[in-house]
Design a protein with these regions (language model features):
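Structured adenosyl-cofactor binding patch, chiefly the S-adenosyl-L-methionine
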Residues: 140-186
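Active-site/ligand-binding-proximal alpha/beta "capping" segment
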Residues: 96-144, 152-155
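Short, glycine/charged-enriched secondary-structure capping and boundary segments
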Residues: 28, 53-55, 113-116, 145-147, ...
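Short acidic loop-to-helix transition motifs that present clustered carboxylates
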Residues: 84, 106-108, 162
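Conserved residues at beta->alpha junctions
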Residues: 17, 104, 135, 165-166
């Protein structure tokens, strides 16, 4: 991994713990897309059994390593220990931009948000972006309100409701396209 193929934007994916092998796919494809760090997250709707069973960090970090090699990444993203929702709320302040894809986001998408930030000349200060994706079953309305109060931007990913393992890919791709290197250099 000698080349620097990293994006100027660091993306931190706060992923509501999914069932079965979905986290493997999330880590593999998210690594290919340029995610910097994966933070498994325990929310109200996370299956209770998953909270005690998340013991596959070594395996997920190996998946990240292999995906980083395959996609010629300069760094290997880290998969952290799971954190609780309260810790997510604390992280909102630490990042330049924090996005929450949500099915009830009233047609306010990532492109609209980025254009608004460009018009306000705030876009050049954005280097660290958090994306919070809920688990199967989605995000509680109370969690959305708490995230909004902390300054998170609630955004739509379109008319269709995406699976938990898809939403992070779409949000990351849109961010990389709008702010970084996925769309090429114009």
């Amino acid at each position: 991994l000698d080349l620097n193929n990293e994006s100027e934007i660091k993306v931190f994916l706060f992923q509501g713990l999914p069932k079965a092998q979905k986290m493997d796919l999330i880590v593999q494809k998210g690594t290919e897309l340029g995610i910097t760090e994966f933070i498994p997250t325990i929310t109200h709707r996370v299956d209770v059994k998953l909270k005690g069973e998340f013991k596959k960090l070594d395996r997920l970090n190996r998946i990240a390593l292999e995906a980083a090699k395959q996609s010629k990444r300069s760094i290997v993203p880290k998969v952290t220990e799971p954190i609780g929702f309260e810790e997510v709320l604390q992280k909102v302040d630490e990042l330049d931009l924090f996005l929450v894809p949500y099915e009830n986001a009233n047609n306010f998408g990532i492109k609209t948000l980025i254009n608004k930030l460009r018009n306000e000349e705030k876009i050049n200060n954005i280097k660290n972006i958090g994306i919070f994706v809920g688990p199967e079953g989605g995000i509680e309305e109370e969690e959305i309100e708490q995230l909004k109060e902390k300054g998170a931007h609630i955004v739509t990913l379109g008319k269709r409701i995406l699976r938990t393992e898809t939403a992070g890919f779409v949000a990351t791709s849109l961010i990389q396209y709008e702010l970084s290197d996925l769309g090429g250099n114009d």
